[in-house]
C-alpha cells in the first residue's frame, strides 16, 4: 500500500482565515486548502523545479504568498490574479475539460544557494516607501529582497 508523503509545512492566511497553504515532503507543488471544504485543494501552485522548503503569506497583500525551494528560487504567487492561471497539460477526461485550479508565479528571485527559509518584513516607518521586503536565508547568508 502506498501512502501520501507527510505534510511538511502549513501556513494560514492572515487575510482569509479559512485558507491554508501547504506542501508535502520532497514536493515542488504548493496546495491551497479551504478548511470549510476539506479533502480537495482549491489551487495548486506550480513553478518550483525542486523540493519546497518554506512558504509564507504576505502580511500586507491579500492573496499573496512567497515560497522558497532547493531550486534556489523565491517565487511570489498572487492567488487573486487570473492572469497567472496555467493551461492544464492534463488532457480532458471523457470529454470534460481539465480542472482550472493551477497557478503559476507572478515574480521570482534567484538566490545563490538553496532557499532554506524566508519571511516578509512588516511595514514600518523604515520601509514605508510602498515596497514589500522579504528576508531570505540560503547557505550561510541572508538577503533582503525588495518587491
Language model region names:
Residues 24-25, 69, 137-139:
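Structural signature of WD-repeat beta-propellers
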Residues 1-18, 50-57, 112-126:
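Canonical WD40 repeat/beta-propeller blade segments in eukaryotic WD-repeat proteins
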Residues 30-34, 74-79, 143-147:
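WD40-repeat beta-propellers
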Residues 9, 16-22, 30-31, 40-43, ...:
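Structural hallmark of WD40 beta-propellers
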Residues 26, 76-78, 116-117:
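Eukaryotic, compositionally biased intrinsically disordered regions
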Residues 1-2, 41-47, 86-110:
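Short C-terminal beta-strands that terminate individual repeats in beta-propeller domains
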Residues 15, 38, 50, 57-60, ...:
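Short amphipathic alpha-helices and their capping/turn residues within compact interaction modules
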Residues 119-147:
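Blade-level signature of beta-propeller repeat domains, shared across WD40, Kelch, NHL, RCC1
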Amino acid at each position: 500500500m502506498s501512502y501520501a508523503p507527510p505534510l511538511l509545512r502549513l501556513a494560514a492566511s492572515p487575510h482569509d482565515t479559512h485558507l491554508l497553504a501547504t506542501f508535502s515532503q520532497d514536493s515542488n507543488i504548493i496546495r491551497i486548502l479551504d478548511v470549510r471544504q476539506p479533502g480537495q485543494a482549491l489551487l495548486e501552485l506550480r513553478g518550483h523545479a525542486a523540493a519546497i522548503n518554506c512558504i509564507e503569506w504576505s502580511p500586507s497583500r491579500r492573496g499573496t504568498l512567497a515560497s522558497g525551494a532547493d531550486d534556489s528560487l523565491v517565487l511570489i504567487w498572487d492567488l487573486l490574479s487570473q492572469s497567472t492561471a496555467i493551461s492544464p497539460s492534463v488532457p480532458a477526461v471523457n470529454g470534460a475539460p481539465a480542472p482550472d485550479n493551477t497557478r503559476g508565479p507572478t515574480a521570482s528571485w534567484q538566490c545563490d544557494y538553496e532557499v532554506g527559509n524566508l519571511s516578509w518584513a512588516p511595514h514600518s516607518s523604515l520601509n514605508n516607501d510602498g515596497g514589500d521586503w522579504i528576508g531570505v536565508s540560503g547557505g550561510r547568508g541572508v538577503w533582503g529582497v525588495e518587491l
